[in-house]
Design a protein with these regions (language model features):
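Metal-dependent de-N-acetylase/amidase catalytic core
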Residues: 1-13, 86-260
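Active-site rim/loop-helix segments in enzyme catalytic domains that contact anionic ligands
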Residues: 1-101, 126, 130-137
Length: 260
């Protein structure tokens, strides 16, 4: 079975928000990928997390090549308005990186239904690979990882590229994850605490990459979690409208696919 022990010549990690790289801490330390970040992670606080991620990634040997293409609220506005040109331009930028840096593995956030930006990374990277002049001929692999789900298990046991962290790296990962979350002063701190409480810290000793598209979004009464959460925020008066998958995100994904 193929393993990430067979290190790629050059990997590209595409993530929705700064901080996601913590999920692949051991892999990042081993592979030292290029990293492209979709948004700046500012969310409702207005405070970017890019500098936190730059310090972390550079200390592990990674290189941030796209430090947050969109201010996070702007990303949602573009999706709600159905604008595709900025995302196609970003896909073309990623394609250029794949070609110029001879990337042979692209890794992205999986589609879990938790957050629209997370779910957008898969179609974005698919478009980038389709637009690349060399990805097909060079056999560039396309992999994904879970951002919020149980990190240890995947749907298909035959589609696993596991990394098992040694004690020192595991302790370092937990310590730096907590430190990053505290420094961010955002909802990320709550999410990190929730994941450690839910899955247990030891689950994060395991990092699993799987073939892109293996994951399926969890649905609640036919809705992705971010739609349900959006409805709650509208009722609370925090949002004016709900970003929905079929109405907003899917058409932008389809346009990306059609143009690439």
């Amino acid at each position: 079975m193929e393993s990430v022990e067979e290190q790629p010549h050059q990997a590209l990690l595409v993530i929705a928000h700064p901080g996601h790289e913590l999920r692949l801490y051991g892999w990042l330390r081993k592979v030292r990928p290029l990293i492209a970040i979709l948004t700046d992670g500012s969310g409702s606080t207005g405070i970017s997390r890019i500098d936190l991620s730059r310090d972390l990634c550079e200390s592990l040997g990674g290189e941030i090549v796209v430090p947050g293409r969109f201010v996070e609220p702007d990303f949602y506005s573009l999706i709600l308005r159905g604008e595709t040109a900025p995302f196609l331009a970003f896909a073309q930028e990623l394609a250029h990186i794949i070609d110029e840096r001879s990337v042979d593995v692209v890794v992205c956030d999986s589609v879990e239904g938790y957050h629209p930006a997370h779910d957008f990374c898969l179609p974005l990277t698919r478009a980038a690979l389709a637009l690349s002049a060399s990805a097909s001929s060079r056999g560039v692999r396309h992999l994904e990882y879970r951002v919020v789900g149980q990190p240890r298990t995947v749907n298909d046991a035959d589609a696993r590229w596991p990394v098992e962290l040694d004690d020192a790296t595991f302790s370092e990962k937990i310590r730096r994850s907590r430190r990053y979350a505290e420094a961010s002063g955002s909802v990320l701190a709550q999410e990190v605490a929730y994941m450690f409480d839910t899955y247990g810290e030891d689950a994060f000793r395991h990092e699993v990459l799987q073939r892109a598209g293996s994951e399926q979004p969890r649905l609640y009464d036919g809705m992705r979690y971010f739609e349900m959460r959006g409805e709650e925020q509208v009722r609370a008066g925090r949002y004016r409208s709900v970003l929905r998958y079929t109405e907003h995100l899917q058409p932008v994904e389809a346009a990306l696919c059609a143009r690439s």
